[in-house]
Amino acid sequence: MRSLLSFVLLALARIAISEETKSCIDIEKGFKEEFNAHKQPVCICADNGIFSTVKGFTIECESASIASVSENLASLNGTELGRLTIRDSTVNVLPQDLFENVFAKQVKLERCGLSTLQPNSFQSLGGSAELLSLRENRIKKLEKGLFTGLKSLKTLDLAMNKIQEIDVGAFEELKKVEELLLNENDIRVLKTGTFDGMKNLKKLTLQNCNLEIIQKGAFRGLNSLEQLILSNNNLENIDWTIFSALKNLRVLDLGSNKISNVEMKSFPKLEKLVLNNNTIDSMKSIKLKDLPSLVVALFDRNKIESIGDMDMFGLTRSDRIETLSLARNNLSQISPKAFQHTPNLITLLLQYNQIEELSSHSPSQVRTPFLASLKKLVTLQLSSNNLSVIRSDELPKSLSSLALDHNVISKIEARALEGMEIKRLYLHSNKLNYLYQGTFDSFSPKSVEAVDVSLNPWVCVCNDPKEWLPRWLEASEEADVAEGALGCLAIPNCGQKEGSTVMPEEEEVYRSGWITVAATILTIVTIVIMVIIAMLYFKDARYQFPLRGRRSDSDLHKLIENDPLNIASDSILVVPAMPKRNTGPKKTVRFQNF
């Protein structure tokens, strides 16, 4: 009862004080006239302005002793602040009265060497602080009662400390906190009940913490948790039931650990599952079931060698899944019906594997394209595999972006891309000598956004009008994003159709000739005009000789200065441009080494 009365009295006192309007000038008058290590005032004030997300004044105190900072903050007398930042000060133990006169929505105490927190250190911030940042300090342990009184806090940032141990109940009073950042610490074990009381927590970040063990019940009570980031740790053998209570979980990131087996069941709201850069060697080791909201699944940078017909059966109910990544594995075998359980895929990433063809062979040697069931696929990444042939029935007709670069492709069948509205096509760094006429007929050169066919051993017959690819690339203009040599495809007019009257080079020479003639005529006319003006000038000067007296040197100097023909030697004669000839459709000529 006494503590409640004290809180009410303190609140009333602050309200009474805040009625008196202050400015940064008024606030800084109360600060001590001393300077920090950079010869600047210990604390300065700034107004956040009308466009800031944080209303009120900002106080910044940098590179000074905590005693000096404390003396300056004492003068605030409860003035309402938007943000208080204390940075690069020296403090090992946080004084309990440091924030006694502070009333701020955001409080940051960063890079101060802080190692010890005392109970109730932040109690005076309870009625105002919504964000508390203690990142980049040296805190080693979080004890129970440290955060007592922070009843309005929504974000707690403890990243980049040296935290090794968290007492059970350390966060139990942070009932309104929605985001907790603990990344880049040294928390090897998460104990049962570590996050008790955080019923409104929505995002928990624990990446890069050397985490090895998560005890059962560590996440109990986190009924509102939506994002759990556990990447870049040393997790190996996980009891997957530790996540079972997280029914509102939308994102689970377990990337860059040592996980070899996965078992995720009954997460009705899970949208993104990240398991990249682990030690999974088989899709059979990934058991997924009842994930109806799953949209993105990332399994890249593992050791998966094959995908069987039933390996992804658990995703049958995940009819919202759009993106699947298996890049940078050791994939060489994909069964004919491997993707039949994920027919709604839009993006499939298979680059940097050992795939040799896009079809599988049954025991009876019947060839079956394994991408045939993906009728909605828009983006397919197959870069850096061992593909040698692309057949006419192997690619989904829905494709818009196709990457086949850095393979050993020597043949693409004439109808392989038929019916596709390709926007981005990458065929560079293969072994293509030619493409059948009509290969690109389904998409016009004007409609593509990017195409690259460079670094192939192209063979061209430039005097043959049937040599279509050079003309197609020329028509694509800026969409041709070739990063390497195009070989004979870059020869000007290669494959040019007969009947063209003026080649681009001839047209340029023709146009340049007319410009030269026009410039010569204008030069001669100008010289004639200058001669006539000079003659008139001397004729006029002859009638001035009978005048008495002589011009002074200054008169002669003035005469020369005012002479309209006194043109500097480096003057530029501007020749009017000749009218443009009607040359028909615009032609683009590309000059490249070949």
From Swiss-Prot:
Protein's membrane topology: Single-pass type I membrane protein
Pfam families registered for this protein in UniProt: LRR_8
Membrane-crossing segments per the record: 514-534
Ranges occupied by LRR repeats: 78-101, 103-124, 125-149, 150-173, 175-197, 198-221, 222-245, 246-269, 271-290, 291-315, 318-341, 343-365, 374-397, 399-419, 420-442
Keywords from the named record: Cell membrane, Cytoplasm, Developmental protein, Leucine-rich repeat, Membrane, Repeat, Signal, Transmembrane, Transmembrane helix
GO biological process, one term: molting cycle, collagen and cuticulin-based cuticle
Entry superkingdom: Eukaryota
Membrane side Cytoplasmic: residue ranges: 535-594
Reported tissue expression: Highly expressed in the pharynx and at lower levels in the intestine, but not detected in other tissues. Other studies suggest a broader expression pattern in somatic tissues: from embryogenesis to adult stages, expressed strongly in body wall muscle, vulva, somatic gonad and pharynx, at lower levels in the nerve ring, hypodermis, and rectal epithelia, and very weakly in the intestine.
SUPFAM superfamilies: L domain-like (SSF52058)
InterPro entries named in the record: Leu-rich_rpt, Leu-rich_rpt_typical-subtyp, LRR_dom_sf
Compartments (UniProt record): Cytoplasm; Apical cell membrane
Subunit structure: Interacts with glh-1. Interacts (via LRR regions) with myrf-1 (via C-terminus); the interaction promotes the role of myrf-1 in the synaptic remodeling of DD GABAergic motor neurons at the cell membrane.
Role, per record: Regulates diverse developmental processes including larval molting and gonad maturation.
Protein name: P-granule-associated novel protein 1
The species this protein was found in: Caenorhabditis elegans
Gene: pan-1
